[in-house]
């Protein structure tokens, strides 16, 4: 069956979007970011008129919000749209490259954490900045409910965005936004004419197994052929440290630089620009659970030790199949297994 993308559901509706909330409910790999970059951004540029003649203050501008630094880097690469690798880790160099790219006159990319920081410094100054934008894109919108358990500041970002619903086109999009949808429907603020859904399509998982102890996981990994790659999501940086000692050069380990122990391997040392793993094993915390597309046919095994369904769905979605035959085995840590079976059936 031919794969469908969210642009085929939205069609030309975006041309007539009025102020308010838009909800895009579609799985990983459904083309949500592609729609923004290849359809909405060119439309904003077109509506702004001639770049050299138009008043910069009248430009139609987009603010793209996301929840993780790796995703921000990926979005910045997508805004360039030239297929080249840009120096997203070197701000001074990146700044010059962005100034030479016309697209960045119409779109800015922030993390939700930046919204939170700016609001704490001055709500009034933040509002003046946000007033410049016509469209607010909330990518990985499950951040507002998924991260709130351990980060009370997420509600600040959500409140800031919600205040703009009456004066902006605010686009929420995620593969796992059911809690938000339920809330909006309960309070009567979700218009079904502004809700775009693409049913979940068959994924890449061909077999599901459970394990319950570290030793079981280690034995499973040791049984995997050397030419088959492994993606392993763990819950703590300390586990990454132990895995690094255990597997040596066979493994790369990725976690947030904001972690108490700091960063480990750079993302660019873990995954190449084409989405292929640079080692047999890539182990990571939830810092990698979105914002990274792995397009590697040799990635045949995904181990997940989280039990939150939102996180599990996102982590499975890091593998982007290149065709119908590009499949993998999924291994889930035993905790919460009964609740998680539905994710891959």
Regions found by a protein language model. Give the residues of each.
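Conserved strand-helix element at the start of the C-terminal RecA-like helicase core
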Residues: 61-72, 223-246
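A short beta-strand element within the Helicase C-terminal
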Residues: 293-305, 330
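Inter-Walker segment of RecA-like/P-loop motor cores
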Residues: 80-123, 267-269
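Interdomain hinge/linker at the junction between the two RecA-like core domains of SF2 helicases
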Residues: 177-223
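Conserved helicase ATPase motor motifs in RecA-like P-loop NTPase domains
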Residues: 25-30, 140-143, 157-185
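Conserved SF2 helicase motif VI
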Residues: 308-330
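SF2 helicase catalytic motif II
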Residues: 127-159
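Conserved helicase ATPase core of P-loop NTP-dependent helicases/translocases
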Residues: 258-284
